[in-house]
Amino acid sequence: MKDRLRDRLARDFYEMLKIQDRPYLSWIAVKGEPPYTQEYLLTIRLRSYALSAARGRYTVGGIHGCTVKVTLWDSYPNIAPNIRMLSIPPVFHPNWYSKGTYCPPEPWSPESSLKDYVIRMLGTIKYDASLIESNAPANYKALEWYEKNRGNGAWFPSDDTELTENSEEETAAAERAALSPGEVIDSWGVR
């Protein structure tokens, strides 16, 4: 691994600690030794919508969380992180392809931080209106459904949880835990 990539992975890892173990998100590093993490598994606790089939009909229903994998390729940060929904069914949203791949509302820039990219992705899951891509959506059916129902204040945004960051003390504690062998790094005891 090139030094430049290692430096960037480490910088992103430390930034990601600012959103570790929040009410809306926990994550674990699943590929690469921290802080040189190349793949994250995110457990998201935000209310959203999914499309399901029952008795020959498709219906949109609420979901209360999902699991997402974030992969950083060897050519990262020149190529955007790949974000893939592992939960079935995936989120039903204009910025998410029906197979569960995230399509950001704005192009990736190598100067962008992974943390900010993940926060924008979380904003789409909770239907933040400023992040809905209507010009070139990944999922046209989801866009049609959203435009038909967006006036329903009870539905949108689908979750009013603020996407806040950890305090400096919480971030420092998360860093100590993440870099200490055998210690817990999230609330479920997963290392």
Residue map of PLM features:
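UBC/E2-like fold recognition across ubiquitin and ubiquitin-like conjugation systems
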Residues: 1-65, 75-191
